[in-house]
Swiss-Prot record:
Protein name listed in UniProt: Adenylosuccinate synthetase
Enzyme class, UniProt record, top EC level: ligase
SUPFAM superfamilies hit by this protein: P-loop containing nucleoside triphosphate hydrolases
Primary localization class, coarse: cytoplasm
Binding site for IMP: 13-16, 38-41, 129, 143, 223, 238, 302
Length: 429
């Protein structure tokens, strides 16, 4: 028996929600270990549709949810999400949800700075959601963050807000934005504290007890490897480490507890917002993929950019993310296409290169090298066994395995939870 860590292997929106939901039914605890409420996913359980941004997916399956220290939490957004899913009949209480006492908090000032800086960038925007995630992580690294445990100590909160506002109000004033008062932030946090503090726990200890008891832990990543602050397409990335190694750091367990690493990838590529995208399609095919795949962001509602599967980037994600196997999603979106292309390499200034460059200037000049494969006419939609797949679809999956140097462990053939082909059980050693 093994733990499982789920991460995105592209730029996010790969269908992690469905896969995590499928795995959560077999886990005992589901842990969020990085990110904030800037990414979301939709889960369909019976007649109910849940849209989650902060809450661990396992809650919809009656499993304990844990928010680790690597997450940044907007307490107001958290409580709003709890209220929303509770109104749908889902139990979210201190019995079912625990939050690390040392988790950094997102305050209204963080969102204000996020939006003011993005506006000041003009046409050089990063593509932030404006929800304060980046500034909250900056405060954590700069050692001025307000953490969940601080809400229990008003005297600590008082002087920490002084230190925080000394920095942030200077920035806001320089950007021509409205500044904040300590009294306003103190009142904001004091009002939220009684509802949030009951969820506080020593999460590293809780998870260690679970490990010793042999309980199955599912670590749920947000965003994806190519949005990792170190290994992604910097600076068009998120503000945290999204690779599997951070499941340990972001929850307080040892690295050996990460277990089987399952990378999620679509059978094609998408990206939201700004940043390089070598295999992006600007033609009718790109629009076709977007329409068939219903490619709109769960949180932002922004249409996603679409393109062919980029095997080079996914192979990089496999290597730096420590991926043991892939879950390939949305294969059915490719049904009926006469031919399918896969990016198998890059060209930079007339020379073939082995990997995607780190320099933004070089990234902008990269051109994809494609391999063309025959499509299939029969549908893969709803297939639940390998034998149900068209021969060309099987060839496509096998070719992806060869190119990314990782086996396809799970195959998703529709948004429905049970339309999943299992080749290997990630929870079994």
């Amino acid at each position: 028996m093994s733990n499982v860590t789920v991460i995105g292997a592209q730029w996010g929106d790969e269908g992690k929600g469905k896969i995590v939901d499928w795995l959560a039914s077999r886990a005992d605890i589901v842990v969020r270990f990085q990110g904030g409420h800037n990414a979301g996913h939709t889960l369909v359980v019976g007649s109910q549709t849940y849209k989650l941004s902060l809450l661990p997916s396992g809650l919809v399956r009656g499993k304990m949810g844990v928010i680790g220290n690597g997450v940044v939490v907007d307490p107001e957004a958290l409580l709003a999400e709890i209220d929303r899913v509770s109104a749908q009949g889902l139990e979210v209480s201190p019995r079912t949800l625990r939050i690390a006492e040392n988790v950094p908090l997102i305050l209204p000032v963080h969102g204000a700075i996020d939006r003011a800086r993005e506006a000041a960038r003009g046409d050089r925007k990063i593509g932030t959601t404006g929800r304060g995630i980046g500034p909250a992580y900056e405060d954590k690294v700069a050692r001025r963050a307000i953490r969940l445990c601080d809400l229990a100590e008003p005297e600590t909160l008082d002087w920490k807000l002084d230190e925080l506002l000394l920095h942030h109000n200077t920035l806001l004033a320089g950007l021509g934005a409205e500044t904040f008062t300590k009294d306003a932030l103190l009142a904001h946090l004091t009002a939220l504290a009684p509802r949030v503090l009951p969820y506080m726990d020593t999460v590293w200890d809780l998870l260690d007890d679970a490990r010793r008891a042999g309980r199955r832990i599912l670590f749920e990543g947000a965003q994806a490897v190519m949005l990792d602050v170190d290994h992604g397409t910097y600076p068009f990335v998120t503000s945290s480490n999204t690779i599997a190694a951070n499941a340990a750091t972001g929850s307080g367990v040892g690295p050996g507890s990460v277990g089987f690493v399952l990378g999620i990838a679509k059978a094609y590529s998408t990206r939201v917002g700004e940043g390089p995208f070598p295999s992006e399609l600007h033609d009718d095919m790109g629009r076709t993929l977007g329409e068939r795949g219903h490619e709109f962001g769960t949180v932002t509602g922004r249409p996603r950019r679409c393109g062919w599967f980029d095997a080079m980037l996914v192979r990089r994600a496999v290597r730096v993310g420590g991926v043991n196997g892939l879950a390939l999603t949305k294969l059915d979106v490719l049904d009926g296409l006469p031919e399918i292309r896969v990016c198998v390499g890059y060209e930079l200034d007339g020379q073939e290169i082995r990997s995607f460059p780190s320099s933004p200037a070089a990234q902008a000049r990269v051109k994809p090298i494609y391999e063309t494969m025959e499509g299939w006419t029969d549908t893969t939609y709803g297939a639940r066994s390998w034998a149900d797949l068209p021969a060309q679809a099987i060839k496509y999956v096998r070719r992806i395995e060869e190119l990314v140097e990782a086996p396809v462990t799970l195959l998703s053939t529709s948004p429905e939870r049970d339309d999943t082909i299992l080749m290997r059980d990630p929870f079994e050693n």
